[in-house]
Regions:
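Membrane-embedded alpha-helical segments and adjacent helix-loop junctions characteristic
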Residues: 27, 47, 61-150, 315-345
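Alpha-helix boundary/capping detector
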Residues: 56-60, 116, 129, 173-174, ...
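Aromatic-anchored segments of alpha-helical transmembrane domains
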Residues: 54, 126-130, 166-173, 279-284
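Transmembrane alpha-helical segments of multi-pass small-molecule transport proteins
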Residues: 118-123, 157-165, 304-312
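Membrane-core helix-loop-helix motifs of multi-pass transport proteins
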Residues: 143-238
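Hydrophobic transmembrane alpha-helices of multi-pass small-molecule transporters
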Residues: 1-88, 208-221, 225-337
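C-terminal TM-helix exit segments that contain a strictly Trp-centered aromatic cap at the helix terminus
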Residues: 52-56, 170-180, 342-345
Length: 345
């Protein structure tokens, strides 16, 4: 494969950003700072454990008592950890389904400029994050790849990638998959020590009050404007091609042909329809018998809804299973960090 240098295209590091606006230059400085100095989120969790343990001992707690408290709480969030992992998987399988790919293709045709495309990605990322942070992360990332294929946009790939994370970085905590709101709304997921203090706090008091909705609207509006203003111009934009990003990979992998009789059910929608009918029937009863806000605040109901939708959109069990296999690595942070949060609690 020809390198960037071989093709005669400038490398990102050689781009002159002196013509950019003050906001764009500030964004580039913060980008360089974050890339060079910020460690993985796991490191921050370990630092939090260290700081909390140190302050506990400074307040007179014996080291072995601190260790016992940490160990006793380590698995207190295990149910919630599994639930949040399913949130990531459910969002991924829905976003990577064939119908979602067609929707992404349609959305990618809408922007008319590179900077406009960055702002558009920011809007899509934040709006979808109100439904699911897992859906937002994958859907927006796939949208960036499709937009990057449009040579007429000359979109800055770095800015678009950052915009795709705005849902996870700015608004997801105001949406249905908010870990804090979901945790407080589900008594079975809360550690007993926390439940005794706070009790159960439903979505009607966290996500759906008018104050929260206004905050979400203002935050989304300001973030879209900032994404538009901070995006590099078409002259200085670093495109995906300049970064040697492979854009030929398709969003939805084609299923290989059946090679053995045992694969027939994996490629048939029969079992999908049966399972979705059962799950969908339960979901309909749940929403019919309860306040919709109360029903969706149940994390098990929320996860079942996304899994059933993912199964239906993928249609064939093999396609669904392939999507789940690709989604599992995205749960690594949840699986290893949440027990540490439990140890702190």
């Amino acid at each position: 494969m020809a390198t960037v240098a071989d093709s005669g295209t400038a490398r990102p590091s050689s781009i002159d950003h002196s013509g950019e606006g003050a906001l764009a230059r500030l964004g580039l400085r913060f980008t360089n700072l974050a890339e060079n100095w910020f460690p993985d989120a796991y490191v921050f969790v370990c630092l939090a454990v260290t700081v909390v343990a140190a302050f506990a001992m400074l307040n007179g707690a014996a080291p072995m008592a601190v260790a016992k408290s940490f160990g006793d709480g380590f698995w207190s969030l295990i149910t919630f950890t599994m639930q949040m992992a399913i949130v990531a998987i459910g969002g991924y399988v829905v976003a990577s389904s064939p119908p979602a790919a067609k929707l992404i293709d349609g959305l990618a045709a809408m922007p008319r400029s590179g900077a406009g495309a960055v702002a558009f990605v920011a809007a899509v990322s934040m709006l979808t994050s109100l439904l699911s942070w897992g859906l937002s992360l994958i859907f927006s990332g796939l949208l960036v790849r499709v937009l990057a294929r449009r040579a007429d946009l000359r979109m800055d790939y770095r800015a678009a990638g950052a915009a795709a994370y705005l849902g996870l970085g700015a608004t997801w905590a105001l949406g249905l998959s908010s870990s804090s709101a979901q945790l407080q709304a589900n008594a079975a997921s809360l550690p007993k020590s926390v439940l005794q203090i706070t009790g159960v706090i439903p979505f009607s008091e966290t996500i759906f009050p008018w104050q929260s909705l206004v905050i979400a609207l203002v935050l989304i509006s300001i973030s879209i404007v900032l994404a538009r203003l901070s995006a590099p111009s078409s002259v200085t934009a670093v495109t995906a091609q300049m970064m040697d990003v492979d854009l030929e990979q398709t969003q939805v992998a084609q299923l290989p042909g059946r090679k053995r009789p045992g694969e027939w059910l994996e490629y048939s929608p029969l079992l999908t329809l049966i399972v979705v009918a059962l799950g969908g029937g339960w979901i309909v009863q749940e929403f019919a018998s309860k306040d919709p806000i109360l029903a969706i605040s149940n994390l098990n109901t929320y996860n079942l809804l996304f899994l059933m939708l993912g199964m239906l959109l993928h249609w064939r069990p093999r396609s669904f299973l392939n999507a789940v296999a690709k989604a599992v690595p995205a749960t690594a942070g949840v699986l290893i960090q949440f027990p540490l949060y439990g140890g702190i609690a």
